[in-house]
């Protein structure tokens, strides 16, 4: 796995760096054991986005079965970090979701309420 990826027993994020997009594919269960590694991974992705001046991070949650509230709060913090960044380094988070998974529908709609300029949800 590359520097923008993570894997443990129950949770994985595999990331790919494109020209102006970073794609991160989540799978498994983002539970209490995922909080610290996910926080670190988000910081590394953010730093890479700023470094390469990417315009978007695509976050594919379609294979993610569960995410606890603490992990979801990390996304709220990430959005806040984007909003506080200088305009020339702001980027969009595009979530690919599974519309059949109820927690994704509810949580991502709430996250999108923070800003529709920098959070997009594709179902």
Where are these regions (language model features)?
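Amphipathic alpha-helical interaction surfaces in cytosolic regulatory modules
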Residues: 26-119
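STAS-typified acidic loop motif
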Residues: 1-43
């Amino acid at each position: 796995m590359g520097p923008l990826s993570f894997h443990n027993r129950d949770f994985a994020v595999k990331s790919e760096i494109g020209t102006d997009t970073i794609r991160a594919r989540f799978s498994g269960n983002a539970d209490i054991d995922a909080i610290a590694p996910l926080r670190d991974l988000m910081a590394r992705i953010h730093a890479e986005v700023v470094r390469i001046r990417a315009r978007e991070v695509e976050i594919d949650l379609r294979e993610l079965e569960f995410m606890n509230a603490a992990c979801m709060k990390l996304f709220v913090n990430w959005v806040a970090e984007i909003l506080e960044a200088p305009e020339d380094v702001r980027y969009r988070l595009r979530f690919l979701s599974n519309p059949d998974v109820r927690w994704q529908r509810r949580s991502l709609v709430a996250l999108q309420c923070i800003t529709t300029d920098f959070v997009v949800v594709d179902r």
